[in-house]
Amino acid sequence: MTVTVRVSAKVNLALGVGGLAPDGFHPLATVFEAICIYDEVAVTRRDDSRITLTVSGEDADQVPTDETNLAWRAVELVREEFASEWGKRGHGADIHIDKSIPVAGGMAGGSADAAGALMAAAALCRLPYSPEELQPLAAQLGSDVPFCLTGGVALGRGRGDRLAPVICRGRHRWVFATSNQGLSTPAVYRRFDELGGTPGGETVPNDLISALTRGDLDAVAASLSNDLQAAAIDLRPELEEVLTVGREVGALTALVSGSGPTCAFLVRDTAGAKKVSAAVSNLPQVHRTRTARGPAAGAQLLPGPVGSFA
C-alpha cells in the first residue's frame, strides 16, 4: 500500500541570525512563508526490511538516494520510535520523491521531503499524522521540517523550529531565480561567522508582522530582510547582479532566499512577474525561473487508500 503527501517550498520573509552559540547552532528569528511549488513524496510498504529511495523531476540527479536524505531518515525515525505500530516483521519501505522544489536552493526542499515522508510513514502505520501531532518528530529531523508540516506563514524562534502562526491577509506573487550551482548551508553560516555575525541579531521583525497582518504589500516589501544574504553573496558574488536586475525591472524587492543561492523577487502582479522572470532568465548564472504564489498549505495527504504495516 502507498501513501502520497504533497509538500510545499518556503521562503524566509525575514531571517534574523544571532551569533554562534555554545551548542554550535545560531539562534534565529525568522518569518516563513510556504510557497505553491510542490514536491510529492510517496511511501510504499515492503515485505522485507529494506528502505529504498528514488527521485524523479527537476534536478533529480542532484538528490541523494541513501540514508543521508532527510526523507529516508524520517521513515527510519518512525520505524524506530513506533516499532510495534510499524509491524512485527520489521517492514521496510520504498520512498519516491517527485521534485519541483529547487535542490540546494534555500527553499527547504530537503526539509519538505522529510515532512512528507514523516506524514506518509505515520499514516501507513495508522499513527496520528496531523502536522501538530508530528511536530516533536519533525524537530528531530531538522530546523525547517516543523514549518514544512504546518505551512502558511509562521514566526520561527530558537533554531527556527519553535513556531507561532502569523496572520497574513492577502496573497503574494513571487519570482524565484535558481542558480546553476548549489550553495551549502553550513558554508554560508561559516562565512556569516567569519564576516562578524550579528550577536543578538535574532530579533522579532515587528514591522513585517504588522504589515502581513494589515495586508499592506508595499510595507511587506519594505520589511523583508535576510542576515545571511551578505554571506551568500560573498561566496557567490554573481548573485548580486541577479538581485539588481530584478529590482531594475520592477520587483518590489529582491533578496536571497534563506541560505541561497535562489533569489526571490516579490512582485505586484502577473505582468510584473513576467517582466522580472524574462529579465533575470537572460543572465548566465540563472538556471531557471519559477513564478509562484504564497502563502500555501503545509503537508497534505493526497486522496487514496491508506494501508497498514500490521
Curated annotation (Swiss-Prot):
Report the EC code(s) recorded for this entry: 2.7.1.148
Instruction: Write out the GO biological process terms.
Output: isopentenyl diphosphate biosynthetic process, methylerythritol 4-phosphate pathway; terpenoid biosynthetic process
Keyword terms of this UniProt record: ATP-binding, Isoprene biosynthesis, Kinase, Nucleotide-binding, Transferase
InterPro entries per the UniProt record, alphabetical = GHMP_kinase_C_dom, GHMP_kinase_C_sf, GHMP_kinase_N_dom, IspE, Ribosomal_Su5_D2-typ_SF, Ribsml_uS5_D2-typ_fold_subgr
What Gene3D superfamilies would the database entry show?
3.30.230.10, GHMP kinase, C-terminal domain
One Gene Ontology MF term: ATP binding
**Source organism's superkingdom?**
Bacteria
Name its pathway. Isoprenoid biosynthesis; isopentenyl diphosphate biosynthesis via DXP pathway; isopentenyl diphosphate from 1-deoxy-D-xylulose 5-phosphate: step 3/6
Task: Note the coiled coil stretches, chain numbering.
Answer: none
Q: Name a Pfam family for this protein.
A: GHMP_kinases_N
Reaction catalysed by this enzyme: 4-CDP-2-C-methyl-D-erythritol + ATP = 4-CDP-2-C-methyl-D-erythritol 2-phosphate + ADP + H(+)
Residues the record marks as active site: 10, 144
- Positions binding ATP in this chain are 102-112
The annotated region (Disordered) lies at: 289-310
Function, as annotated, reads: Catalyzes the phosphorylation of the position 2 hydroxy group of 4-diphosphocytidyl-2C-methyl-D-erythritol.
Regarding protein family, the annotation reads: Belongs to the GHMP kinase family. IspE subfamily.
What name has this protein been given in UniProt? 4-diphosphocytidyl-2-C-methyl-D-erythritol kinase
Gene behind this protein: ispE
